[in-house]
């Protein structure tokens, strides 16, 4: 009894009202019922197309678009090596920008003060590391910095990978950037 009252209060009653609605057919307004059935519409005829051929003369104005976007700073010409002989540390951001343009940089620090030259090497080496580039000491106070698209190898055929670090011998008499290893003298 209490359960029945609760069902009635909530609105869950076991009446057959709902079942009656499904047995009746739907009634349409007279305007819809009096219309004759629509004729079947034939699909539009298929137009055969010629295969699309793209060439260098295709322009945007013709309606055909090329979705390939070139990488900034990358061109299909010959790789470029820029030799930089800075006189101060203020020129180092320009070296980083050159590396970002995917150009290799030979950095000759012979004309700089040793302390400022060490700072310059550290700065450019950090930028090169951040870009997954490569660095190599190629002479006394001369360094090669390359972007990650350039593979550096020596005459002996050993390639220098980005995860390898160059072996250096520390000495109190020589700064790290100026000490030449015996393997470079070969």
From Swiss-Prot:
Q: Which InterPro entries match?
A: Cell_div_SepF, Cell_div_SepF/SepF-rel, SepF-like_sf
Q: Which Gene3D superfamilies match?
A: SepF-like protein
Disulfide linkages recorded for this protein, renumbered to the chain, are: none
User: Which intervals carry biased composition (Low complexity)?
Assistant: 159-171
**Superkingdom of the source?**
Bacteria
- Keywords, comma-separated and alphabetical: Cell cycle, Cell division, Cytoplasm, Septation
Which biological process, per GO, is one annotated for this protein?
FtsZ-dependent cytokinesis
Q: Where is the composition biased (Acidic residues)?
A: 16-27
Q: Name one GO cellular component term.
A: cell septum
Region annotated Disordered sits at 14-59, 157-186
Pfam families associated with the record: SepF (PF04472)
Keyword Cell division attributed: yes
List the subcellular locations.
Answer: Cytoplasm
Q: What does this protein do?
A: Cell division protein that is part of the divisome complex and is recruited early to the Z-ring. Probably stimulates Z-ring formation, perhaps through the cross-linking of FtsZ protofilaments. Its function overlaps with FtsA.
Subunit structure, briefly? Homodimer. Interacts with FtsZ.
Return the similarity comment. Belongs to the SepF family.
Name listed for the protein in its UniProt record: Cell division protein SepF
- Give the species: Synechocystis sp. (strain ATCC 27184 / PCC 6803 / Kazusa)
